[in-house]
Amino acid sequence: MNSQFKLIGFDLDGTLVNSLPDLALSVNSALAEFELPQAPEELVLTWIGNGADILIGRALDWAKEQSGKSLTDEQTAQLKERFSFYYAENLCNVSRLYPNVKETLETLKEQGFILAVVTNKPTRHVQPVLKAFAIDHLFSETLGGQSLPAIKPHPAPLYYLCGKFGLYPHQILFVGDSRNDILAAHSAGCTAVGLTYGYNYNMPIADSHPDWIFEDFADLLKIV
């Protein structure tokens, strides 16, 4: 390995895994229990990226606009619990790895890079997803939404990786599909790759000014 980078970090949803179908199904299953309207998948896409609480908050705001119905705090907490239940039961029913993800991760691991996952996804769901696609063994660290006091776009997860592995920020390359990924990386002093195929609230990743922009996950091999 002859690279300035020693560790490569990855977002999960929209970067490694296309989890939108299962997330949308779980959101709508929870909404249905409270007789709220069903959201189209392309709309749920714009709600992803800031963790489960904000995802459900956006869903409820939309449902209120559509139906005029609002939930009490207790009902909102119950709906969040139901979403978590449905998603735990449907983590990988329809979700798939994006093209070239597994092969590229294996190559990077063989080349000696430390690999890590940094996601805002609920921590308890992260390992089951990685295991379902048989890539969990490739990562030396996995950080979810409850692993640390702060989540992306805060740089704390990347600072944590620096401390754990004894690295400087410039030795970390972070790969993601949303502005939160790019903001977190740049705030920490890390280099950022933006992927065009992910979610990012339906906005071009170029608007967030990553250091590189790729359409294919395998293109990472060109810069390391």
UniProtKB/Swiss-Prot annotation:
<dbReference type="InterPro" id="IPR050155">
    <property type="entry name" value="HAD-like_hydrolase_sf"/>
</dbReference>
<dbReference type="Pfam" id="PF13419">
    <property type="entry name" value="HAD_2"/>
</dbReference>
<dbReference type="InterPro" id="IPR041492">
    <property type="entry name" value="HAD_2"/>
</dbReference>
<comment type="similarity">
    <text>Belongs to the HAD-like hydrolase superfamily. CbbY/CbbZ/Gph/YieH family.</text>
</comment>
<keyword id="KW-0378">Hydrolase</keyword>
<dbReference type="InterPro" id="IPR006439">
    <property type="entry name" value="HAD-SF_hydro_IA"/>
</dbReference>
<dbReference type="GO" id="GO:0008967">
    <property type="term" value="F:phosphoglycolate phosphatase activity"/>
</dbReference>
<keyword id="KW-0479">Metal-binding</keyword>
<dbReference type="InterPro" id="IPR037512">
    <property type="entry name" value="PGPase_prok"/>
</dbReference>
<dbReference type="GO" id="GO:0005975">
    <property type="term" value="P:carbohydrate metabolic process"/>
</dbReference>
<feature type="active site" description="Nucleophile">
    <location>
        <position position="11"/>
    </location>
</feature>
<keyword id="KW-0460">Magnesium</keyword>
<dbReference type="InterPro" id="IPR023198">
    <property type="entry name" value="PGP-like_dom2"/>
</dbReference>
<keyword id="KW-0119">Carbohydrate metabolism</keyword>
<dbReference type="GO" id="GO:0046295">
    <property type="term" value="P:glycolate biosynthetic process"/>
</dbReference>
<comment type="function">
    <text>Specifically catalyzes the dephosphorylation of 2-phosphoglycolate. Is involved in the dissimilation of the intracellular 2-phosphoglycolate formed during the DNA repair of 3'-phosphoglycolate ends, a major class of DNA lesions induced by oxidative stress.</text>
</comment>
<dbReference type="GO" id="GO:0046872">
    <property type="term" value="F:metal ion binding"/>
</dbReference>
<dbReference type="GO" id="GO:0005829">
    <property type="term" value="C:cytosol"/>
</dbReference>
<comment type="pathway">
    <text>Organic acid metabolism; glycolate biosynthesis; glycolate from 2-phosphoglycolate: step 1/1.</text>
</comment>
<feature type="binding site">
    <location>
        <position position="177"/>
    </location>
    <ligand>
        <name>Mg(2+)</name>
    </ligand>
</feature>
<dbReference type="InterPro" id="IPR023214">
    <property type="entry name" value="HAD_sf"/>
</dbReference>
<dbReference type="InterPro" id="IPR036412">
    <property type="entry name" value="HAD-like_sf"/>
</dbReference>
<protein>
    <recommendedName>
        <fullName>Phosphoglycolate phosphatase</fullName>
        <ecNumber>3.1.3.18</ecNumber>
    </recommendedName>
</protein>
<feature type="binding site">
    <location>
        <position position="11"/>
    </location>
    <ligand>
        <name>Mg(2+)</name>
    </ligand>
</feature>
<feature type="binding site">
    <location>
        <position position="13"/>
    </location>
    <ligand>
        <name>Mg(2+)</name>
    </ligand>
</feature>
<dbReference type="GO" id="GO:0006281">
    <property type="term" value="P:DNA repair"/>
</dbReference>
